[in-house]
Regions:
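Short loop/turn microsegments at loop-to-beta-strand junctions
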Residues: 9, 55, 108-110
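Core segments of cupin and vicinal oxygen chelate
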Residues: 12-64
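Residues that form or flank phosphate/diphosphate-binding pockets in enzymes
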Residues: 20, 79, 92
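Short, solvent-exposed beta-strand edge segments and adjacent coil->beta transition regions
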Residues: 5-9, 79-83
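Short coil/turn motifs at beta-sheet boundaries
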Residues: 3, 51-53, 77-79
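Vicinal oxygen chelate
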Residues: 1-3, 35-36, 61, 68-72, ...
Length: 167
């Protein structure tokens, strides 16, 4: 059995929602699965304080990317300093991920959101990246001005801004 399949895997620290969160993320993204669930043993309870047999770690994959979710307790919470970007090829895809990831969460500016577990995501159209990399600084400036006014990205509105049309 090969345990390590990629060099780096984000470890997400939850209070006690690791398995629930992993199941949610696996339901949102294609090519996703839960690989293993590890449980707390009797040993070490004086340190970890978790009931024996309760979920300790969940090894899972989102869109082929390996993650680990850990039920470590309430000491640490997620913040915006670390987030995950979801690259989308179409408005339908932007809409889907925005809807699913904000279920029980909170919308933010410029494509950012917090999911129901407090994890930060940015749902990003690939077209936006292409427009922002244009050598014509006036085009990318118009796109930036447009997306700074948005929560969920609107690809057609971004394209209109890129072309110099009124948004």
């Amino acid at each position: 059995m090969q345990i390590i399949t990629q060099k780096i895997a984000p470890c997400l620290w939850f209070d006690s929602e690791a398995e629930e969160a992993a199941k949610f993320y696996v339901s949102v993204f294609k090519n996703s699965k839960i690989n293993t669930v590890g449980r707390y043993p009797d040993e070490g309870q004086e340190i970890h304080g978790k009931p024996a047999g309760s979920v300790m770690v969940v090894d899972f994959e989102i869109a082929g990317q390996k993650f680990v979710a850990l039920n470590g307790g309430p000491q640490f919470t997620f913040d915006e300093a670390v987030s995950f970007q979801v690259y989308c090829e179409s408005q339908d895809e932007v809409d889907y991920f925005w809807r699913r990831l904000t279920e029980g969460g909170k919308e933010g500016p410029c494509g950012w959101l917090k999911d129901r577990y407090g994890l930060s995501w940015q749902v990003v159209p690939v077209a936006l990246l292409e427009m922002m990399l244009d050598r014509d600084a006036s085009k990318s400036a118009r796109v930036m001005a447009a997306f700074m006014q948005m929560k969920k990205f609107d690809i057609e509105a971004l394209k209109r801004a890129y072309e110099g049309e009124t948004v």
